[in-house]
Amino acid sequence: MSTKIDGKQIAAEIKTNLAERVNKLKAQGIQPGLGTLLVGEDPGSMKYVAGKHADCQEVGITSVKKELPADASFDDIAAAVRELNEDPACTGFIVQLPLPKGINENAIIDMIDPAKDADGMHPYNLGELVLHVRGDISTPLPCTPRGVLELLDAYDIDLNGKEVCVLGRGITIGRTIGLMLTRNAVNATVTLCHTGTRDVADHMRRADVIVAAMGSAGFVTPDKIKDGAVLVDVGVSRVYDEEAGRYRIKGDVDKACYDKASAYTPNPGGVGPMTRAMLLANVVEMAERHA
């Protein structure tokens, strides 16, 4: 029987631990704070940011919110980033992406103080991840890849020497999880598949673990995986449900794969809650480093 990897449960346990650590920091006169910069009124982005602040309230982290209109200029956004860099109430912060059309997102991310980069996506912090194959890393780690590894660890899924096939090369998960999986502490062997990969299914069938992050609904089907594979579904697609008359979130892994797998993350309810929990963890760890 395959094991359902419950991201909601593990994220809840992590948040309980973080709340205890926040209380210890407060006893030392240190109040962790998460800042968010939201530009425009995209419903998805607004909902996501609201969820982050609800998480903050749950563990005792202060919310620092900055909002700009959709027609904000590059200079307006840059000024808001500088304000968050200098705000002592803000331990770490994120710039909610995507930014409005025409705004250079990479240039904005570059302006974030690496020590306040709650998403772990600043070039300096990614560089630290590239350089430090051994030992501990004291800089923030990308939230989604970290969440995946924490989730697998919570279920005692050993990745040492395992063949891991990563589907998708986006910076949020595909490229960065490869760096984390190949660190000495994890020691997996990684194949990164993308749009230029020949015979993706052949790579998938050899994998002990598949991390699907393509945004292609139901791409991973039973004929493409081996018996007993571990399936981690990070893909997000909005698919119209004719019966319900509305859009639903669907992952990259077809549910028909679950019986063939040894373990799987549902989607939604698998990796998503862990990504949010890791954002909080990054902020608490930033505060602890300055305690």
From Swiss-Prot:
The keyword NADP applies. GO terms for biological process: L-histidine biosynthetic process; methionine biosynthetic process; purine nucleotide biosynthetic process; tetrahydrofolate interconversion. CDD domains: NAD_bind_m-THF_DH_Cyclohyd. It catalyses: (6R)-5,10-methylene-5,6,7,8-tetrahydrofolate + NADP(+) = (6R)-5,10-methenyltetrahydrofolate + NADPH; (6R)-5,10-methenyltetrahydrofolate + H2O = (6R)-10-formyltetrahydrofolate + H(+). GO terms for cellular component: cytosol. It comes from the Bacteria. The keyword Calcium does not apply. Pathway: One-carbon metabolism; tetrahydrofolate interconversion. SUPFAM superfamilies: Aminoacid dehydrogenase-like, N-terminal domain, NAD(P)-binding Rossmann-fold domains. NADP(+) binds at G168, R169, G170, T195, V236. Its EC number is 1.5.1.5, 3.5.4.9. Pfam families: THF_DHG_CYH, THF_DHG_CYH_C. One of its GO terms (molecular function) is methenyltetrahydrofolate cyclohydrolase activity. HAMAP family: THF_DHG_CYH (MF_01576). Catalyzes the oxidation of 5,10-methylenetetrahydrofolate to 5,10-methenyltetrahydrofolate and then the hydrolysis of 5,10-methenyltetrahydrofolate to 10-formyltetrahydrofolate. NCBIfam families: PRK14193.1. Belongs to the tetrahydrofolate dehydrogenase/cyclohydrolase family. Homodimer. This is Bifunctional protein FolD.
